[in-house]
């Protein structure tokens, strides 16, 4: 069975059996080379990434402690464990509508990083819009006046959002407070 048929057959990620089956499948040699790579992510967690459009994208979250895996992003670059309710829409006020629409569609075309797990949670940075240099060619043409927009949230070991994604406007103290909130929630 190819990987896409596997997901069609196992849509319900809440099903522990499906998560265990996915864990088994992702721990085969096929997902350790070529267009796939598995990297340690701290606390017995791992991220399985796939090359999509020439970039490594975090597709799956593996929890070695419980021998389960969860689809974080699908092959069409849509986030699977993040829902619209997991975004702090107030924090996005004042940014361009097309950027907000990327968040609405849960589009992960631009960089997204799942940082190392610490105290049961991982910080996720999700770039909704790159700065204008992203569009520049090797000769220096094509640059736009776009501003980078990146939002941050925190997830648990299953990829579920614990603290909503929000635009912190580079207020790193706010990010520290979000981490503390996530750790408090997860360790109740």
What are these language model-derived features?
Residues 1, 12-13, 184-188:
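Short intrinsically disordered terminal tails
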Residues 1-8, 58, 176:
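Short, aromatic- and cysteine-enriched interfacial helices/patches
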Residues 5-18:
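Low-complexity, charge- and small-residue-enriched intrinsically disordered regions
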Residues 18-188:
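Residue-level detector of conserved, function-critical positions
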């Amino acid at each position: 069975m190819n990987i896409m048929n596997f997901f069609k057959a196992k849509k319900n990620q809440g099903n522990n059996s499906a998560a265990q089956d996915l864990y088994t499948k992702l721990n085969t040699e096929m997902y350790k080379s070529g267009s796939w790579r598995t990297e340690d992510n701290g606390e017995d967690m791992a991220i399985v990434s796939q090359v999509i459009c020439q970039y490594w994208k975090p597709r799956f979250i593996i929890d070695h402690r419980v021998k389960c895996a969860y689809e974080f992003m699908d092959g069409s670059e849509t986030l699977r464990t993040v829902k619209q309710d997991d975004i702090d829409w107030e924090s996005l006020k004042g940014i361009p509508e097309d950027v907000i629409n990327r968040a609405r569609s849960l589009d992960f075309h631009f960089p997204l990083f799942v940082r190392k797990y610490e105290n049961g949670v991982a910080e996720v940075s999700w770039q909704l819009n790159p700065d204008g240099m992203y569009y520049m060619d090797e000769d220096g043409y094509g640059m736009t006046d776009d501003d980078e927009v990146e939002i941050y949230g925190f997830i648990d070991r299953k990829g579920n959002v614990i603290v909503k994604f929000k635009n912190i406007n580079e207020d790193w103290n706010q990010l520290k407070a979000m981490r503390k909130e996530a750790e408090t929630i997860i360790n109740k």
